[in-house]
């Protein structure tokens, strides 16, 4: 089972292939919201790193936001085209859900988890998670300055993507800085163990 994971939620394009023996191969391109021009090259580079052909992909996972609508559509359309072309199942999850998936118990077990990613201006997307469910609560869009009012640093720790740290004000929080490659491995591991159920797109 080789899983292709595509993310165009941010201004960049990230593609990972997690192989049957749980090796991860990642390509990242800081495309500055020009994913449509770079996504094919990113895929081909990742396939080359993994030493796989497209026909060897058994399932595809694509993130579905939140974020720039055009960027999200590029990733979803690209993933759907591949899925239909190779007759592979296509699944989706939000980027906030993706950030919430850990293969092992996190080190801040005494606090609740929130996934955070920047929106436009001084706003951020936030969602709370627990170990028992992929998504426990509704996603919120709030001002960065209101984060501590809504989610006390004494009660919550934060998961965020590594290349977005500079866009977030997290000084008073315990946090875990996530790498896309590790996130991909954690996601596939959880799916294999049937600990999470993803939405299938058809």
Kindly give the residue locations of the regions a language model identified.
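Oxyanion-binding and handling regions
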Residues: 1-22, 36, 91-202
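DPxDG-like acidic metal-binding loop motif
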Residues: 59-95
